Amino acid sequence: MGNTQRESVFEPEFRSDLQYWAKNDRKILLKIFDLIEAVMREPLDGIGKPEPLRHKSTSTWSRRITKEHRIVYKVSAEKINFVQARYNY
């Protein structure tokens, strides 16, 4: 799955979360950008302790931003939908 080029889609909530971090904590925003790059390279492995979300569809994953906050994304063969970047799922 790793070397497939996928389209990245930022859902409205995810974009809103990025705006929040841009205003409130640029260090976290930069970490989110690092996580986005890692997800695009290898969606199911890498930094941030990737894990599937059991209560969602099998294609929904999360990675740790901080102890409190997670990035949540959905993986398909064609694209990766970034869903949220604040709070826990």
Features from the language model and the residues they span:
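Residues that recognize and position ribonucleotide moieties
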Residues: E7-S8, G46
